[in-house]
Amino acid sequence: MPETLQELRVGNDEVVDADHTSAALTAGTLVFGDGATQVFTSDGHTTYTDRGRPSQGDSWVLGDGKFVSFWPPDYQATYVVRWVVTEGAITGLTFTETERGARFEGHYL
């Protein structure tokens, strides 16, 4: 579990509160099932790396459990963010796109 999240007591699949969304996103590198990684920074930038090819985007928090991800030139999506908790420890996040329902699960490196 990332050190910055150790004080939180949350359940698996629980929506991430607005107060904790930035901390959840920036707690560490997320690794997805296909090996892609994503890093969020506190200044609202994000880098998604797939097969060694990085792409840069931006993100911002909307409210409880929701954030927006923008990828130039024109892709924007809103996601609901939920905790992944294993044996009482926060191990990652799930992202569900609000418009299409696509779900992605990332685990902290």
What are these regions (language model features)?
Residues 1-56, 62-109:
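Lipid interaction determinants
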